[in-house]
Amino acid sequence: MKKTVLITGATSGIGEACARRFARGGYQLLLTGRNEEKLDALRKELEDAGAVVKTLVFDVRDREAATTAVDSLWEGSFAEGGFEGVDVLINNAGLALGLEKEYQGSYNDWDTMIDTNIKGLLTMTRVVVPRMVERGCGHIINIGSVAGDAAYANGNVYCATKAAVKALSDGLRIDLAETPLRVTNVKPGLVETNFSVTRFHGDKQRADNVYNGIKPLTGDDIADVCFYAAEAPAHVQIAEVLVLATHQANGTVIHRETK
């Protein structure tokens, strides 16, 4: 029986890269996101390559929608096709918005980051993990960030949400220590995706400046790390992985080449 991976935020960036990597690795895919058109396009691409894919359209901030969508997996054609449960949950959905001083930030940006990066992750964990415990198998991979290790200038709330991801990952690992389930916190540094465009509310020039003078990581690099962790032997729990671009030392020290 093929393993099944559920990936949140699968329509772009690290989530989309994880979908392709796990498809190549022979997994069945449950892909979630807010953009139905992008999900359908990715599903078609992966199905054409031979993967088994089901898409679920919802926002992880909507607890009722997330719960209903996940519960539906145990009904209908997908269940009839041999679906036994989620083997790997990749809590990828997340974002940064704005880069202002803490006393000048946008309330709306704060709410969106907290509701997505923390509450959304908690919702998916609460909905999926009990069934993993019942089955006696499963792996939760949370996409954290180097930003969760220490705050950087004007990153305040985003850094706080990723620090929360670390704490939640560590706490869940403790809660599951008596089970065969594993928990991994993957902490990327600079990854060139649509992350910075989103942070700067569509200002591509400002987003591009984030990566000037350094070769950043790609979504594929992080997807490879996630796949490696998921495929490790059952007795091996890769608890935490910090992945940085070669010229990035931590969240604040980056050497940039100048022309």
Indicate where each model-derived feature is located:
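C-terminal helical subdomain
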Residues: N185-G189, Q205-T252
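Residue(s) in the substrate-gating loop at a strand-loop-helix junction
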Residues: S145
